[in-house]
Amino acid sequence: MFDKVIRGTAVAMLLTCAAPVLARGPAAKTAAAATLAPSARSAAATVDAFHSALRRGDTQAATALLANDVLIFEGGGVERSRAEYESHHLGADAEFSKAVPSMLTRRSGEAHGTMAWIASEGRITGTYKGKPVDRLTAETIVLRRVGREWKIVQIHWSSAAAR
């Protein structure tokens, strides 16, 4: 029950906090639409630490930043726990992150109480397994403060071929 309340709260917070940005539509690409609130800086640092660990291939450090009940959405699929992610895509994600450089192009986020959201856009370019990669990326991460640390409770990744 508590888990459902936390997830519901996270979704409600994400939608509430993002509503002003979403309401503007694509024509309103203003500086305000890409603002990281000061309250979210430490949560964003956790997101950066997660990606840094993946790039180093340090899967233990990466998973230490995930809540046990993390939800990870990618490519139409979902992994419903840290253990499931560890046993399925973690190794491949680390391998890909090590091989293909990424560039953060835009970030926004807010934190309220024990919950935070970080939305990032970027571009990945390089070669992976002998094939060229050039993709625009979008990522939304929801975090929950546990004591003095942020834990990642939800990740949604998507990408599209760059034009």
What are the functions of these language-model segments?
Residues 85, 103-109, 122-124, 138-144:
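Hydrophobic/aromatic beta-strand elements that line small-molecule binding cavities or substrate pockets
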Residues 59-111, 133:
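A solvent-exposed, acidic/Ser-Thr-rich amphipathic alpha-helical stretch
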